């Protein structure tokens, strides 16, 4: 199993068979607390402990450990999850405090969804995480991407012991790669082969890493920089591990993927997989935390997309853009020099500065939207060039609990022309504050198990991030009738229309059997982009079935609950209290947000 930055807080891969498993397997449910479950999970996923900054004290031994990505390791994790479910049920039904019961109940929802996914013996089922995929390795999945990013961004090196732990994890990486390769071989035997265009992109990204000299690789240069003041030949040791272990393991994985490529077809959707329709139904349920069918999601996406385009049309006309479809006019606006950045490194620097400015502007406005504030500790960083080819435009998430590792807003700067001055503001609010980084810090105030399972509720997390974009507008960032203000409102509506369009193409690809070309053409017209410009997005949907649907489902539900509370409470409704309730309750199924709204109405 592999991890994204956010998923480090919410995914596990087994390295040990915990002592609780034999008792659970015999039908005896051992007495447990939510802290017991959290501690066990961290020992299954030591990288998560490091990312959270809690691999200290009793958990200090985890800093040099790595998760087990082999078939046996994944099977152990599955066994642990199945064993944890009755233990959590006992906590919910037992005499404990309300906070522990709620945390256990939320964790139950996450673990049950993951356990349902184990019925499909291929790909990667996240354990209370959002990144489910039918392919073990792809252009945006695999330790070839995640391990360098983790070691560089999250593994601290302040002491000799820290540096040795870094070396230990680097030395364990070949075993992780080989574990993934073994699962790729097993999936090949099941007929699970990624689309040809996905394999081409994946092998291309791997070749970028493989083509570097060991001394220049991120995971070597990062250690050399971090350990500069610590006596030892750290860089030389890392280079030897890379040359003797990592590169041969990467070669073995690439060789297996090349075998996959000889068998690959262009079919893009999950429907082609063993039990493909059932797999997609599960993936859609995992992503939305609802029972919406593909047809319902598809229809809702079309409806919302049309509504946002009607609003965009009015703004475009006010800006003098009156001819052609909304998509065609947005393509024209994308080239307007008033809203573009320079090419090359100059434009990349401009974009980073622009984002920092938007963060500085929104920060003092946030007390208007919340009674309870968090730090909003965020750093803006470029996605590594080797990852950019298969990465989305941006992503973000919180840092460590103690704040020593900041939250990150990762921005794809492969081509500065992909970003404009009217779409970057709303993207910033989505990924940084008051979006993912902001929400993640509230989630870290929960009991530890609640923090760990938060990644399992994509509809809430992404719904909140879209709601954060909405909050920014409500806080006045687009007030006024200047061209810049109108363009900013247009960027926000375009973001919403973009997420509505995702619902259409995701269900189109996986349920309606759209080809990649049909999905790209529809999406390009719907979003005002080019076919080339939307290709990475479409390819992402191909390998993460259902995930793209959670955004608007979650955003719509949060707004539905807000309107319900306003109608029921009248003058008692408190805007800031509602926002506190939604974000302070942590990442959870949408049904829990509805329950919390009921309590707010009745209070």
What are these regions (language model features)?
Residues 26-603:
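N-terminal maturation segment of proteins
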């Amino acid at each position: 199993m592999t991890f994204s930055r956010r998923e480090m807080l919410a995914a596990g891969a087994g390295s040990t068979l915990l002592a609780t498993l034999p008792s659970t397997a015999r039908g005896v449910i051992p007495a447990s607390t939510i802290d017991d479950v959290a501690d066990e999970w961290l020992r299954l996923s030591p990288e998560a402990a490091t990312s959270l900054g809690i691999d200290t004290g009793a958990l200090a031994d985890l800093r040099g450990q790595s998760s087990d990505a082999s078939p046996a390791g994944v099977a152990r994790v599955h066994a642990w999850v199945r064993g944890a479910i009755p233990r959590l049920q006992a906590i919910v039904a037992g005499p404990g405090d309300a906070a522990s019961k709620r945390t256990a109940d939320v964790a139950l929802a996450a673990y049950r969804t993951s356990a349902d996914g184990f019925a499909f013996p291929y790909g990667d089922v996240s354990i209370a995480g959002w990144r489910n995929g039918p392919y073990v390795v792809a252009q945006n999945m695999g330790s070839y991407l995640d391990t360098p990013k983790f070691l560089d961004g999250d593994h601290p090196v302040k002491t000799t012991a820290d540096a040795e732990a870094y070396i230990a994890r680097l030395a364990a990486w070949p075993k992780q790669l080989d574990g993934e390769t073994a699962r790729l071989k097993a999936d090949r035997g099941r007929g699970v082969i990624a689309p040809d265009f996905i394999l081409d992109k994946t092998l291309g990204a791997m070749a970028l890493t493989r083509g570097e000299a060991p001394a220049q690789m991120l995971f070597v240069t990062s250690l050399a920089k971090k350990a500069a003041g610590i006596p030892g030949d750290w860089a030389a040791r890392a280079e030897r591990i890379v040359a003797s272990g990592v590169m041969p393991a990467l070669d073995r994985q690439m060789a297996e993927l090349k075998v996959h490529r000889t068998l690959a077809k262009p079919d893009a959707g999950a429907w082609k997989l063993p039990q493909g329709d059932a797999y997609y139904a599960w993936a859609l349920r995992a992503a939305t935390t609802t029972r919406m069918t593909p047809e319902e999601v598809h229809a809702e996406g079309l409806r919302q997309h049309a509504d946002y385009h009607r609003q965009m049309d009015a703004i475009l006309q006010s800006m003098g853009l009156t001819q052609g479809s909304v998509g065609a006019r947005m393509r024209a606006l994308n080239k307007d020099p008033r809203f573009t950045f320079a090419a090359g490194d100059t434009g990349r620097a401009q974009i980073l500065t622009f984002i920092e400015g938007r963060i500085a502007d929104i920060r003092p406005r946030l007390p208007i939207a919340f009674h309870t504030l968090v730090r909003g500790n965020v750093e803006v960083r470029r996605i590594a060039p080797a990852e950019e080819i298969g990465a989305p435009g941006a992503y973000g998430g919180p840092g460590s609990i103690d704040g020593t590792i900041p939250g990150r807003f990762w921005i794809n700067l492969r081509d500065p022309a992909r970003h404009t001055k009217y779409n970057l503001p709303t993207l910033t609010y989505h990924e940084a504050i008051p979006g993912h980084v902001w929400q993640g810090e509230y989630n870290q105030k929960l009991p530890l198990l609640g923090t760990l399972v938060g990644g399992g509720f994509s509809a809430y997390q992404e719904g909140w991030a879209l709601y954060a974009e909405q909050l920014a507008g409500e806080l006045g960032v687009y007030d006024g009738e200047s061209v810049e203000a109108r363009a900013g409102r247009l960027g926000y509506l375009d973001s919403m229309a973009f997420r509505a369009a995702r619902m259409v193409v995701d269900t189109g690809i996986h349920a309606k059997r759209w080809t990649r070309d049909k999905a790209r053409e529809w999406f390009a017209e719907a979003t005002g982009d080019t076919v080339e410009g939307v290709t990475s997005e479409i390819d992402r949907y191909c390998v993460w079935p259902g995930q793209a649907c959670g955004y608007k489902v979650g955003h719509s539900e949060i707004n539905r609950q807000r309107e319900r509370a306003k109608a029921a409470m009248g003058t008692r409704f408190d805007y800031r209290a509602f926002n506190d309730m939604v974000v302070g309750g942590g990442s959870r199924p949408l049904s829990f947000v509805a329950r919390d709204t009921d309590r707010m109405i009745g209070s």
